[in-house]
Amino acid sequence: MIQTESRLEVADNTGAKSVQCIKVLGGSHRRYASVGDIIKVTIKEAAPRGRVKKGEVYSAVVVRTAKGIRRADGSLVKFDGNAAVLLNAKLEPIGTRIFGPVTRELRNEKFMKIVSLAPEVL
């Protein structure tokens, strides 16, 4: 469950280390985002020679949440922290590598590029 002001780690190689959610997209008063949802983020911490700089605003897709995702069979998939992957204006990933596992739910949300780059799909 990601909401405005939530901090997330970045699961790609764009150079950003930490981002902060500034808006949950999808409705005028939408409060929470889960895995597969698109949010607006600002870069809070970045590597010195990365592709992105601190303070820049990007779209991102949530790939892991500590709250977890409930599957149709009743199982619950949780992670240690919250993570996102940065997207460009066409909603394609900016980075060329994804770190850590991602969930199968991203496949339904039309993020096949992220699923194919990920080292593990849960």
Swiss-Prot record:
Asked whether the UniProt record includes Nucleotidyltransferase among its keywords, one would answer no
Q: Which InterPro entries match?
A: Ribosomal_uL14, Ribosomal_uL14_bac-type, Ribosomal_uL14_CS, Ribosomal_uL14_sf
Q: Name one GO cellular component term.
A: cytosolic large ribosomal subunit
Molecular function as annotated in GO: large ribosomal subunit rRNA binding; structural constituent of ribosome
Please tell me whether the keyword Amino-acid biosynthesis is annotated for this protein: no
Fetch the SMART domains from UniProt: Ribosomal_L14
Question: Which family does the similarity line name?
Answer: Belongs to the universal ribosomal protein uL14 family.
Q: Which HAMAP family match?
A: Ribosomal_uL14
What does the record give as the function of this protein?
Binds to 23S rRNA. Forms part of two intersubunit bridges in the 70S ribosome.
Oligomeric form and interacting partners: Part of the 50S ribosomal subunit. Forms a cluster with proteins L3 and L19. In the 70S ribosome, L14 and L19 interact and together make contacts with the 16S rRNA in bridges B5 and B8.
Q: What is this protein called?
A: Large ribosomal subunit protein uL14
The gene behind this protein is rplN
